């Protein structure tokens, strides 16, 4: 895991109390059948968003308006649409609450947000840090590394070709009077 | 007008493609001509093309038969083969829509790396397949182009007997099941290759995250999106995988060559394919599994036992939290990725003149995205907002915990692991894990919509069997057993082990 802090990049390994375990060998067909016929939980537990849970999540009209704006969607919605949206956001929050099961504290605000687990090789095994000389050499080499497939050379991406069914330009009318 | 609906019936049902598939596989001696010509016709008519589950490729579909094209393709390990690409994989010769109205007029200025690699290996692209818009869904009903039905069942929608093809790569799986091509490309974010493959009775392989380039794949959730392969022949899947398993410097998430080489030597040393330890994660034994699915699971584990392998029960507790983690990460990443679509530089733009630039963007996005995509963008932005809390960070922590728990279960040390304590004692650990792909076979359209009308989370929780491997980036394949699928999962990077076990299992089917 890569950690970005005031001292720069460091790699650290978070210690978890690991609860996974290797169980017994299923020696016979009967053992296998018994194991598959002994469910340990049900998906209904995840969606049993009972009224109490749903009501504990407060989603105001102001929040709905903010989220619509953040998403660049039309904020002019009907009361019914707003109700549906409140219900969807509440259901999502009840669903997300399962993230905090087995946690000692249920506070959903973390003090540090400089860690971010990803499955990217360089996050876990970063190479040697670059020296200034190497960095400058890389900058020097940039002009030879431009790639038309990435649109990095003049004219390699033609907007008109990308929108063959559209007029090439959008027009915005200035407000009259 | 904002179109937010908790449950959305498809705007239109388009069974024509599936009828064609059904008829082709059932009675027509040479289905290719009719199918290709119909695609050429629809391709000429750009309006009706939008109603088709497969859009034609102008490069490969203008000759009289597909086989002529394939025979003249360049020499390579896939010479003579044909394929179909999910329409969220960009190509220069036709529109790349992601099954969204907002990209219905978008033509990419570059080809995806996977398309270039397949071209170089001699395979011929026949067309692009339908999907849930931007990959968001498990049914291929959330598409601007209509619903793709499952060719294994009746496609008479009126009788209520039509079944969904699964999703989001439902078009790719249906095309393979209908024998339209040797293989199809899909993308798998939380099970979108494996689940439709299972529903349509085909093989669906999601390789390790980072194995196959994502350059040219329209992003949904970039920390999870993986290109996958669907075919009815496991050997074809393996050949295609070997063509695509290449480092790509255009994709920052691509596994570097030194990691690939290290994995190659480790996997060949560590796996003795005649005596494997097979794990059965107890958290996958949910009360919701159908009796048929349990029978299929039992039969595969029994086969493995009869082959001389050891079957063990294992526990990976964080599997129970994986769905909450997945839908936090996926919606947040979707909200970010889809913020680029404004219909100004490219994509569908409104004909109505707007007074402000902002109004233009709002109109384009509100009219351009379907209801499910809008809901996921809103959920993502809400999840990321200060009103709700720091859930994204928490979800990545649960993801990390899940990866560590899988590391404790697998024999093979994780190639990223620098925690030596994790790997002290590996005896008795597993080489592979085996679980069903879906909790039941494909539901009918009616059943599917009824289920989701109650609560949209019903659709989300059905991904419980596929999402854990996505979060951990594990190579996982779904192999068919009738109208069900069984998943074989390996440690991160152990793709070949997964393929080898699958080949053996498919031999003794």
Curated annotation (Swiss-Prot), chain A:
It catalyses: L-glutamyl-tRNA(Gln) + L-glutamine + ATP + H2O = L-glutaminyl-tRNA(Gln) + L-glutamate + ADP + phosphate + H(+). InterPro entries: GatF (IPR027499). It comes from the Eukaryota. One of its GO terms (cellular component) is glutamyl-tRNA(Gln) amidotransferase complex. Residues 1-16 form a transit peptide. It is an enzyme of class 6 (ligase). Belongs to the GatF family. This is Glutamyl-tRNA(Gln) amidotransferase subunit F, mitochondrial. It comes from Scheffersomyces stipitis (strain ATCC 58785 / CBS 6054 / NBRC 10063 / NRRL Y-11545).
């Amino acid at each position: 895991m890569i950690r970005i802090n005031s001292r720069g990049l460091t790699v650290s390994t978070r210690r978890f109390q690991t609860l996974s375990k290797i169980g017994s060998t299923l020696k016979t067909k009967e053992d296998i059948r018994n194991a598959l016929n002994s469910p340990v939980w049900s998906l209904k537990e995840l969606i049993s968003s009972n009224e109490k849970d749903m009501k504990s999540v407060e989603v105001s009209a102001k929040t709905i308006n903010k989220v619509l704006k953040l998403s660049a969607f039309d904020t002019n919605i009907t009361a019914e649409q707003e109700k549906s949206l409140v219900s969807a956001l509440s259901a999502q929050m009840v669903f997300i609450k399962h993230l905090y099961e087995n946690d000692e504290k249920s506070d959903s605000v973390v003090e540090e947000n400089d860690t971010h687990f990803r499955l990217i090789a360089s996050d876990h095994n970063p190479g040697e840090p670059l020296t200034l000389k190497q960095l400058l050499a890389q900058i020097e080499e940039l002009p030879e590394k431009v790639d038309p497939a990435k649109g990095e050379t003049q004219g390699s991406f033609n907007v008109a070709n990308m929108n063959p069914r559209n007029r090439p330009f959008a027009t915005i009318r200035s407000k009259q009077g | 007008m904002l179109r937010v609906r908790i449950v959305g019936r498809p705007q239109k049902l388009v069974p024509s493609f599936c009828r064609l598939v059904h008829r082709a596989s059932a009675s027509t001696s040479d289905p290719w001509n009719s199918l290709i010509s119909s695609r050429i016709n629809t391709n000429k008519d750009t309006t009706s093309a939008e109603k088709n589950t497969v859009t034609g490729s102008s490069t490969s579909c203008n000759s009289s038969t597909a086989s002529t094209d394939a025979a003249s393709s360049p020499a390579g390990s896939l010479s003579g083969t044909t394929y179909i690409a999910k329409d969220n994989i960009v190509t220069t010769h036709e529109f790349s829509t992601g099954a969204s109205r907002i990209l219905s007029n978008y033509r990419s200025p570059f080809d995806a790396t996977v398309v270039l690699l397949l071209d170089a290996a001699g395979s011929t692209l026949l067309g692009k397949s339908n999907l849930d818009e931007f990959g968001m869904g498990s049914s291929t009903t959330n598409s601007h182009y209509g619903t793709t039905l499952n060719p294994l069942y009746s496609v008479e929608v009126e009788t209520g007997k039509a079944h969904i093809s699964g999703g989001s790569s439902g078009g790719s799986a249906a095309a393979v099941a209908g024998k339209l091509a040797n293989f199809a490309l899909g993308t798998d974010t939380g099970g979108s290759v494996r689940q439709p493959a299972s529903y349509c009775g085909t093989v669906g392989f999601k390789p390790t995250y980072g194995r196959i380039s994502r350059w040219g794949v329209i992003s949904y959730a970039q920390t999870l999106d993986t290109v996958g392969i669907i075919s009815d022949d496991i050997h074809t899947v393996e050949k295609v995988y070997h063509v695509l398993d290449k480092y790509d410097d255009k994709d920052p998430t691509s596994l570097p060559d030194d990691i690939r080489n290290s994995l190659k030597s480790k996997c060949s040393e560590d796996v003795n394919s005649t005596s494997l330890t097979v794990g059965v994660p107890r958290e996958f034994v949910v009360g919701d599994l159908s009796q048929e699915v349990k029978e299929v699971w039992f039969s595969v584990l029994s086969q493995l036992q009869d082959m001389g392998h050891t079957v063990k029960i294992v526990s990976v507790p964080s599997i129970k939290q994986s769905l909450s983690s997945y839908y936090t990460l996926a919606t947040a990443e979707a909200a970010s990725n889809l913020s680029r679509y404004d219909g100004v530089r490219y994509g569908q733009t409104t004909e109505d003149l707007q007074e402000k630039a902002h109004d233009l963007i709002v109109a384009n996005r509100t009219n351009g995205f379907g209801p499910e995509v809008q809901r996921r963008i809103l959920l993502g932005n809400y999840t990321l907002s200060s009103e709700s809390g720091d859930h994204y960070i928490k979800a990545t922590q649960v993801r990390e915990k899940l990866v560590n728990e899988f590391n404790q279960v697998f024999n093979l040390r994780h190639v990223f692991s620098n925690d030596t304590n994790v790997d002290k004692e590996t005896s008795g650990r597993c080489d592979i894990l085996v679980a069903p792909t879906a909790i039941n076979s494909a539901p009918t359209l009616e059943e599917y919509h009824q289920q989701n009308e109650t609560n949209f989370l019903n659709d989300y929780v059905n991904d419980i069997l596929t999402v854990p491997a996505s979060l951990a980036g594990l190579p996982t394949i779904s192999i068919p057993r009738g109208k069900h699928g069984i998943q074989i999962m390996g440690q991160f990077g152990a793709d070949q082990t997964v393929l080898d076990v699958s080949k053996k299992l498919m031999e003794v089917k």
